[in-house]
A protein has these predicted regions:
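Subset of outer-membrane beta-barrel
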Residues: 4-180
């Protein structure tokens, strides 16, 4: 008896070859504050604070203080690499009881990396980095519902043009958020 299948033998064994993760600027998803990070990234469900831009900027209209400033520093993956870190600066200001503005600056330093070719020849050392600037406006829509619009500029310099065909990357993004 011969059985035939359309599957590749390696796929039947669960081996499909390299599975490269191609997430662009993954530093954007790292929680900037110790509280949110220690609670499993659940900052969406917490009380409004200056770090709300990362979770939902529509929360800013529910801020208790008129103005907040926050500064955060996280040594990232310290057990693996000793010089990779995330720095975060946040500012939020309630214009009145119904609206607020906020801005953040996020800087991610990948540490010092030695670039080599396929033969192991060194092509210099470099400190790859990425950063993003966010600006948001939030407005109360009802007593329990608010909305916001936010814009973001993203900069990524991971290779310093040391890799053929590579260049600095940058992008802009916009978000619309609702909070109930």
């Amino acid at each position: 008896v011969v059985a035939q299948s359309g599957s590749n033998y390696n796929e039947l064994l669960g081996q499909r070859g390299p599975n490269v993760i191609t997430t662009a600027v993954p530093f954007i998803s790292i929680s900037p504050d110790a509280r949110g990070g220690s609670m499993g990234e659940c900052g969406v469900a917490t009380e409004t604070d200056v770090y709300s831009m990362h979770y939902n900027p529509a929360k800013y209209t529910f801020m208790k203080d008129r103005m907040s400033i926050g500064l955060g520093y996280s040594p990232w993956l310290r057990n693996l690499v000793d010089d990779m870190n995330l720095a975060y600066l946040a500012f939020a200001y309630k214009l009145n009881n119904e609206s607020a503005i906020a801005a953040t600056l996020r800087y991610f330093n990948c540490g010092e990396i030695t670039y080599t070719d396929e033969y192991g020849t060194s092509h210099g050392e470099f400190r790859p980095n990425e950063w993003a600037v966010d600006v948001a406006y939030s407005r109360m829509l009802t007593d329990y519902l608010s909305g916001s619009v936010a814009g973001r500029f993203i900069y990524s310099n991971l290779t310093q043009n040391l890799v053929d065909g590579s260049s600095v990357g940058w992008s802009v993004a916009a978000d619309v958020a609702v909070y109930y």
